Curated annotation (Swiss-Prot):
<protein>
    <recommendedName>
        <fullName>Recombination protein RecR</fullName>
    </recommendedName>
</protein>
<feature type="domain" description="Toprim">
    <location>
        <begin position="80"/>
        <end position="175"/>
    </location>
</feature>
<keyword id="KW-0479">Metal-binding</keyword>
<keyword id="KW-0862">Zinc</keyword>
<keyword id="KW-0234">DNA repair</keyword>
<keyword id="KW-0233">DNA recombination</keyword>
<dbReference type="InterPro" id="IPR034137">
    <property type="entry name" value="TOPRIM_RecR"/>
</dbReference>
<dbReference type="InterPro" id="IPR000093">
    <property type="entry name" value="DNA_Rcmb_RecR"/>
</dbReference>
<dbReference type="Pfam" id="PF13662">
    <property type="entry name" value="Toprim_4"/>
</dbReference>
<comment type="function">
    <text>May play a role in DNA repair. It seems to be involved in an RecBC-independent recombinational process of DNA repair. It may act with RecF and RecO.</text>
</comment>
<dbReference type="GO" id="GO:0008270">
    <property type="term" value="F:zinc ion binding"/>
</dbReference>
<dbReference type="Pfam" id="PF02132">
    <property type="entry name" value="RecR_ZnF"/>
</dbReference>
<keyword id="KW-0863">Zinc-finger</keyword>
<keyword id="KW-0227">DNA damage</keyword>
<dbReference type="GO" id="GO:0003677">
    <property type="term" value="F:DNA binding"/>
</dbReference>
<dbReference type="GO" id="GO:0006310">
    <property type="term" value="P:DNA recombination"/>
</dbReference>
<comment type="similarity">
    <text>Belongs to the RecR family.</text>
</comment>
Amino acid sequence: MNRPRPVEKMVGIIKKLPGVGHKMAERLSYHILKMPQVEVDRLIDSIQNARRTMKCCSICCNLSEHDPCPICSDVTREKNIVCVVETPQDLIAVSKVEDYKGLYFVLGGALSPLDAVGPDDIRIDKLIKRLKRDSINEVIIATDADSKGEITAVYLADIIKILGIKVTRLGYGLPVGGDIEYADEITISRAIAGRKEM
């Protein structure tokens, strides 16, 4: 027996979420259908509210309710160092490390020639404009330790070095092929401390 069309549509939409396969989408769909209506309404409201209120910070491109975001607005942070990450989730992971007091920049992805993601598809131009505008002495490249992250790191390092800015890469306390957002604070802290100039 086939699933009812509304459920099939729901499964199709949910499985578009990252890390959600067909079976998980099916489980989530049926779970949502069993939830009390008040909980479903809360879920819908929270999604709509987040979509409505979250903005992209005009300085670092992090998601925030405010522009500029609280990190960019924090006068106690070191303004001459920028940590470049792929996603807002990576920024959150790195920001849990108390050792790092600088600023951030969220690329919005990583270069991936196989997926046709080039420099124009992520915020490299915006990063370079910021580096030229602000008095930045060092850029820490904190892209993932996978092939896409490495390609992105090398590409960025080549461009940023031309500007006369020191470029470092997180030390390899992070596992190769791993995502920064899943690393614990101690690992990220050691990676920041062990960063190397590129």
